[in-house]
Amino acid sequence: MTTQSDAQFTARTLSEALPYIQRYAGQTIVVKYGGHAMGDASLALSFARDVVLLKALGLNPVIVHGGGPQIGKLLDKLGIVSEFKDGLRVTDEATMEVVEMVLSGPINKSIVRAINQAGGKAVGLSGADGNLLRAEKATRTTRDPDSHIEQIVDLGFVGEPSEVDISVLNALLQADAALIPVVAPVGVGADGARYNVNADTAAGALAAALKASRLILMTDVAGVLDKQKQLIREIPASQVELLIKDGTAVGGMIPKLETAAQSVNHGVGAAVILDGRAPHALLMELFTEHGAGTLVS
């Protein structure tokens, strides 16, 4: 395209986005940020700019981030062996020290710096700040194949959200503050113990408490795929359990779908599972007719 046609294309795109900008103005959008999008410098810059644009357009983005690969690298460097059960990292005291160090430290602050460098005003915090994210010990069971007796699986300091206090987020999201919260998913128990909370689950809990217009879960696939590997554009929350039972949703997609459905059932406008590897995936989802990824409504 010529320079003029480039400009016309940009202008047309902005004009077509107007109804969606008006729809979401003043609305809270909770974004779980992680996967390849967080590890790629170009995509990280694109994400930061998109978040700043959302804020400039009148939306209230709240970012919740993961950090599994970075945690794994530091554990390896320190010689701490990781064990996984049902896709969850068994978290002993030594591992929890590393989890909190990585999530609340370098990862959180790198996202904050990127957003601030792009012109925003990001503030980093964890679920421990202001009792934002209360957690309780996660419980899992497994059935012995011989005796068929259910046994409790001890995951250590792996937690699940039990209560959310959004007062600190509300203070940051006030119109005159214009701040963008960036939350590390470290929860605190009633006894003061720290818990490693799955980032998708934490984002879903915050979205429900905030009554967010959208929960967006960024991942490394296009969205939920059917058995022919084609993207499913929309799924009613009531159908999620069926897709899990019939084997359409497998592996890591199961907890994402469960989180999406639970958030919708608890007052979130809709949840979207989309490919964070696609540049400007956030903008495509919110400001174009067909969106991006899979919508759970």
UniProtKB/Swiss-Prot annotation:
One of its GO terms (cellular component) is cytoplasm. It catalyses: N-acetyl-L-glutamate + ATP = N-acetyl-L-glutamyl 5-phosphate + ADP. Keywords: Amino-acid biosynthesis, Arginine biosynthesis, ATP-binding, Cytoplasm, Kinase, Nucleotide-binding, Transferase. Pathway: Amino-acid biosynthesis; L-arginine biosynthesis; N(2)-acetyl-L-ornithine from L-glutamate: step 2/4. The keyword Ubl conjugation does not apply. The record marks K32, K256 as: Transition state stabilizer. It comes from the Bacteria. It is found in: Cytoplasm. CDD domains: AAK_NAGK-C (cd04250). Substrate binds at G67, G68, R89, N196. Belongs to the acetylglutamate kinase family. ArgB subfamily. HAMAP family: ArgB (MF_00082). Catalyzes the ATP-dependent phosphorylation of N-acetyl-L-glutamate. This is Acetylglutamate kinase.
